[in-house]
């Protein structure tokens, strides 16, 4: 609550200062209202704000929040005992770990830093992938955040354009 009032005060102060050149366009009553709002914020004692926050916390229905959390916990515990769910979770964790870390394997010839990444691993260019693979970007250069580039098997129309390591 304090933060919101301070932020409102800073914004109002900024607006008042920023509109100094535009006073002719704004009506005097609007500027007066902004100034009164700033004065009101400055006059409000912090103790009353803390009391308001405490009152809001007392009115909040904590029991409902705790019962909802307890229900979610019980559902999660029940799901964790399901064998199919355990298998799917284990597979998902392993897949995420492999995609994130990038599995290394022995390259046919040295490329870039003498390491190359497994198929499906995120890459930035062909030098990240093995010589027999290439870096494929489905979204091109315009949206790499949504569709990541990955190392793929080199086909007849695609080639690894990374120069051989010296």
Curated annotation (Swiss-Prot):
What is known about the tissue distribution of this protein?
Expressed by the venom gland.
Molecular function per GO: toxin activity
Subcellular localization(s) per the UniProt record: Secreted
Q: Where is the signal peptide?
A: 1-18
Proregion span(s): 19-58
What does the UniProt function comment say about this protein?
Answer: Has antimicrobial, insecticidal, cytolytic and cytotoxic activity. Active against E.coli DH5alpha, E.faecalis VKM B 871, B.subtilis VKM B 501, A.globiformis VKM Ac 1112, P.aeruginosa PAO1 and S.aureus 209P in submicromolar or low micromolar ranges. Lyses human erythrocytes. Kills HeLA and A549 cells.
* UniProt-recorded name of the protein: Spiderine-1a
Which species is this UniProt entry from?
Answer: Oxyopes takobius (Lynx spider)
């Amino acid at each position: 609550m304090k933060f919101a009032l301070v932020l409102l005060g800073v914004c109002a102060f900024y607006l008042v200062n920023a509109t100094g050149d535009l006073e002719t366009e704004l009506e005097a009553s609007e500027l007066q209202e902004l100034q009164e709002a700033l004065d009101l914020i400055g006059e409000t004692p912090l103790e009353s704000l803390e009391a308001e926050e405490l009152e809001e916390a007392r009115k909040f229905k904590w029991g409902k929040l705790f019962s909802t959390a307890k229900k979610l916990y019980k559902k999660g515990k029940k799901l964790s005992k399901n064998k199919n769910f355990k298998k799917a979770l284990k597979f998902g964790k392993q897949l995420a770990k492999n995609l994130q870390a990038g599995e290394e394997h022995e390259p046919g010839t040295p490329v870039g830093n003498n390491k190359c990444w497994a198929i499906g691993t995120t890459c930035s260019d062909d030098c990240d992938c093995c010589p027999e693979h290439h870096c494929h970007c489905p979204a091109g250069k315009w949206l790499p955040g949504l569709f990541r580039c990955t190392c793929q098997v080199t086909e007849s129309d695609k080639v690894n354009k990374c120069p051989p390591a010296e």
